[in-house]
Amino acid sequence: MSWLDLVTAYLGAVASGDVRAVKQLVSEDVQYKDEVMELNGLDELLTIVGPDYRMQIQNWAYKNKLVFVEYTCWDYTGDYSKDVVGVYSINPMGKISQIRMYS
């Protein structure tokens, strides 16, 4: 599961009011095969910290089974940042699919 999958799953759970799913998704750290990412807090600015980057949710909205996510990505290896907006759909089973990305 990529960091963005994790974020959209979190937002989908929050938007649908599924408290159990939120508790399951949010933990002190999430172990991946090659690295550890941290999920910091359940507040509006969800931050994910990787070994050489940081991503922070700036804004998000849920409407008509669509999740709109605006986030900022800081890449420490290339020393740059970019703002990205992603649009995702949530089907009745809770599966989230990416529709479009703007950067």
For the regions a language model picked out, list residue spans one by one:
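C-terminal and inter-domain tail/linker signature
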Residues: M1-S103
